[in-house]
């Protein structure tokens, strides 16, 4: 389905130069002279390569229709991730590369949203937040409480993140699955 370039949004799947791309970021740029244009960062669904593309706001782009389907994470099978449809109990096997950096945040029985184009999986959405345990945290340096300085910490999944000075090793925190950043202390 054709649409104007200025209607492109992150998460959409488009076809460009005979290949399928998922849109990572889009930005409307209005230079001082001349017309506005859209700068889009996108990832090739087959190779995983990223590229930037620019279109005038009036240009048309082929947007592919995606179907969202809910699955539950089951287990790892080598370099593949096995998901299960909670309604039909059918299994879907995906390469772990489709998850990108978010792979580290997968947890047993985690609900996932898989984007399909013509039956082919093209992307996976994790829940926006996940609760993890802090395994290592640097000690607090006295005198730093006046500023909003964060300290490095290691999470139970092996991801490093920055946490406020009051967080200690052994505590559970909520982090964003998008970038691994600290949200809050877990309330459990």
Curated annotation (Swiss-Prot):
Its main location: cytoplasm. One of its GO terms (cellular component) is cytoplasm. Involved in peptide bond synthesis. Stimulates efficient translation and peptide-bond synthesis on native or reconstituted 70S ribosomes in vitro. Probably functions indirectly by altering the affinity of the ribosome for aminoacyl-tRNA, thus increasing their reactivity as acceptors for peptidyl transferase. It comes from Gluconobacter oxydans (strain 621H). HAMAP family: EF_P (MF_00141). SUPFAM superfamilies: Nucleic acid-binding proteins, Translation proteins SH3-like domain. PROSITE patterns: EFP. It holds the Pfam family EFP_N. One of its GO terms (molecular function) is translation elongation factor activity. Gene3D superfamilies: 2.30.30.30, Nucleic acid-binding proteins. Belongs to the elongation factor P family. This is Elongation factor P. Keywords: Cytoplasm, Elongation factor, Protein biosynthesis.
